[in-house]
Regions:
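Conserved G1/Walker A P-loop phosphate-binding module
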Residues: 1-82, 198
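Canonical P-loop GTPase G-domain recognition
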Residues: 3-15, 145-199
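Short, glycine/charged-enriched secondary-structure capping and boundary segments
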Residues: 22-23, 41-43, 86-88, 123-127, ...
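Conserved nucleotide-sensing/catalytic segment adjacent to the nucleotide-binding pocket
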Residues: 67-105
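Amphipathic alpha-helical transducer elements in NTP-driven molecular machines
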Residues: 88-92, 102, 119, 123, ...
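Conserved C-terminal guanine-recognition region of P-loop GTPase G domains, centered on the G4
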Residues: 96-168
Length: 199
């Protein structure tokens, strides 16, 4: 895949608007301001293709990006305290509507801030994917903010804090240093190649 060819395709505000699509999809999920858009921009090798929000929780849309026919999907961030109950319900309906629809979602990249204990919403999302047998990896973001000993401490803590941690692929990522970006691309390439071989 040539990630430099990534283009913004569309944004959808309700599950009914979501396109019926048979293309491979990779989705990105995480707390508001955990760095989803920044991570996607790093993968695409672009500075500002994925929209980085200065007002977390304001925009509740599922944003689709196309890379040579493969879809990269930015799910709206969750857990922002200042949104209304109606917006929270809209978020829930939209995200669940996307994840539970008949789509070819090959992988969900679940972002968790590497510096902190996973939030209640993070754990809820992880359990949702486990319960529904969805393929996912956890990207531990902003790892450049941790020194070696802090990283080891958080690594051990995550094994206790995250359900089924020993069965989940977790990777350190940083959009500042580029750590983990090539590893994620390799996973995407492998999953896309698997599909081409089946065809």
């Amino acid at each position: 895949m040539n990630y430099n060819k990534a283009v913004f395709e569309a944004a959808y505000g309700t599950s009914k608007q979501l396109p019926k699509d048979e293309n491979i999809e990779f989705a990105f999920s995480g707390h508001s301001n955990v760095g989803k858009s920044s991570l996607m921009n790093a993968i695409f090798g672009r500075k500002a293709l994925a929209r980085v929000s200065s007002q977390p929780g304001k925009t509740v849309t599922v944003n689709f990006y196309d890379v040579e026919g493969v879809k990269f999907v930015d799910l709206p961030g969750y857990g922002y305290a200042k949104v209304s109950q109606s917006d929270k319900k809209r978020w829930s309906d939209l995200v669940e509507g996307y994840l539970m629809s008949d789509r070819d979602i090959r992988l969900v990249v679940q972002l968790v801030d590497s510096r902190h204990v996973p939030t209640k919403d993070d754990i809820q999302m992880i359990n949702f994917m486990i319960d529904n047998e969805m393929p996912f990896v956890i990207a531990l973001t902003k790892c450049d903010k941790l020194n070696k000993s802090e990283r080891k401490k958080r690594e051990n803590a995550f094994m206790e804090e995250i359900p089924c941690a020993d069965q989940i692929t977790m990777m350190w990522t940083s959009t500042e240093t580029g750590e983990g970006i090539s590893d994620l691309k390799e996973i995407f390439e492998d999953l896309a190649c698997d599909e081409e071989e089946k065809a």
